[in-house]
Structures are given as structure tokens and as C-alpha cells.
Amino acid sequence: MPEISVQGLSKAFGGVRALHDVTFTVRDKEFLTLLGPSGCGKTTTLMSVAGFQRPDAGTITCGDRTFFDARDKVFLEAQDRNLGMVFQSYAVWPHLTVFGNVAFPLKIRRMKKEALRRRVTETLELVEMAGYAERYPHELSGGQQQRVALARALVYSPAVLLLDEPFSNLDAKLRERARTWLKRLQGELGLTTLFVTHDQDEALSLSDRIVVMNQGEVLQAGTPEDIYRRPATRFTAEFLGHCNILTARAVTATAQGAAELVLHPGGQPLTVSGEDLTAGAEVQLAVRPEAVELSALSEAAGPNAYKAELRGVSFLGDHYLYELDIDGIPLTVTDTRSFPGPSVTVRIPPSACRVLPP
């Protein structure tokens, strides 16, 4: 499977910037996700790769083929790109059976009847829909329609698979099963895949790498773990999962891989590791709720430990969500244990603090 290279992509609609210098590569057999809120430019990027949108600047290549080059005025039409596309709405044709929907791309390619039947049957078996070939879309569930749309995108062996929020119309349980099934299928087939979603759980569970977008720009690209544990911006930290953003001031410069900060003047020092800081610098810290350690107030505190007042608690099945207050500073923490309060000891490990760039 070829790789997709997007370089310097820009696009404006009526003077409103939709994309600005968007650059990334989808590697061979990789599952890459464009993640961001509504209006961030992720779908415009996907539609540009698919050939449904013509950018204003930049290049798009697939292997040794140029799909788009603004400078050389190259624009390959969507039907000539050999890409598989699954839309958010599935777009299965209601007047055709499951077999007819999946067979349509082969019919317009004028595949011989026997080869067509064999290929459609193989593809329906691949997506576990072989027993539904003669049913119509209105006789299928949302998850089944989704598989029909995927089969239709795969049946002609596309170079790359594109998916535009394909799970958004499914309920939570079905989405979870669909994610597991799609990831397994993508791995088995070795499909180079470009996926678009605003759902952080989908991005984390499916992706080999994630490209975080906002306001038409790429903010960060990396593995799910890298982006979650080492966010490059406040937006990324807050958008990908839950995160505490704490304002602190460095009281010592970084020495031997560690520096001391305070959350408020005269406060207890907070040691952070792996960050290059100068004394007096004001910084923002990203701290994940699950990285903070809770204990009963009577237990020994130690370094980076604070007394916190319990302001609220929510039971969420496999864990509790605690809303705490440290000398007027709010902090959200998750823990599997129950703490009755009214006060607890909070310890913030040095490695749990990520200093965000200014």
C-alpha cells in the first residue's frame, strides 16, 4: 500500500481560512487519525485527499502519483484516485440490496459477471455480512449499514481507505464493538487508512498515530501515548481526555533534571522533572487526573504532597471522580477508592507534571 503525503495544504471559503499549511504523512499500512473539534479543518483535509475539495495551495501525493499540486496546476479527479471512502452518513442506496450496493463500484468498472459475484461474496464475508446479501438497507441496523458501506469501499481494492466519522451515528456500545472490529480488519488487510473523528476515545484506541488539528492548523502529531502524556499545547492537553491546568512559578532553575515551583506565593514547593526552566518563570502545568495520588489525611505526606478539601465526588462505575481544592486552586482527581473527606492528602508526582509551552 502506498503512503499519502500532504504538504502545505491551505484552503479558504469566502475569505475565511479553513486550512493553513497542513502537513502530514500517512505511512504505508498505517492507521492515522485527524482529530479535532467541529470546524477545525479535518473533514476539509480529508475531502481534499479524496478529490471532493480543491485546495488553494500545497501538494497531495499517493505513492508516486500526484493528486494535487497548486503550483503546477495538477488536480486529479476523485474517480481517478483509486481511494476507498466511507462517509459519515454511510450513503448506501436504498433501492439496491446489500449485494447490489457492494457490486456497484465493480459494475461501473465493467468487471465480468462471474468475477464480480465472487469478489462481492468475498468482501461481504470479510465484513461478516455474507448472510445479508439479498436484504435492503431499511432491513439493516445502523452497524450493518456501516459494514455495507465499508464493503463497498473495499471491494475494488483501493490504494488507501478514507473514513469520515463513520461511527458517529452508532450508539455507545455499538461504537465500541465497531472500533474493535475495524482495527482488526485494518491490521489483517494492511490498509493504509486516514480516519477523521472528534471522538478522543476513537482516536486513542484505533490510531497508530494522531494528528491534532484546530482552527485549520496541525498542532501536534504523534502516537496516542505521546500526545496524551506529552501534549505540546494547552488545547491538546484539554481536548484529548481530562486534564488539570495549573499556573505555577519556578522558584529554582532546572538542575540535575528537576526544578521547584510554587502554585501560589509562599506555597509548598512542587518539584517537576524533565523540564528546562529558569527561576522566576511563570508556567502552566498539565496534570492528568489519574496521575495524582490520593490518600487519607492522617497518612504521611512527603514531597509534592498537599492538604486538599473535598468539594464534590461522583461515582462513575469503575472509579470515583473527585473535585478538590488546594488553597483555592481547583484540582480534579480520579481514583478507584472511596475517600469520605472532608479533607484528603494529594500527592502530585514530579513525572506527572507536563510544562506547557508559552
Locations of the language-model features?
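Non-catalytic connector elements of ABC transporters
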Residues: C243, A253-P358
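ABC ATPase nucleotide-binding domains
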Residues: R81-G84, Q88, V92-F235
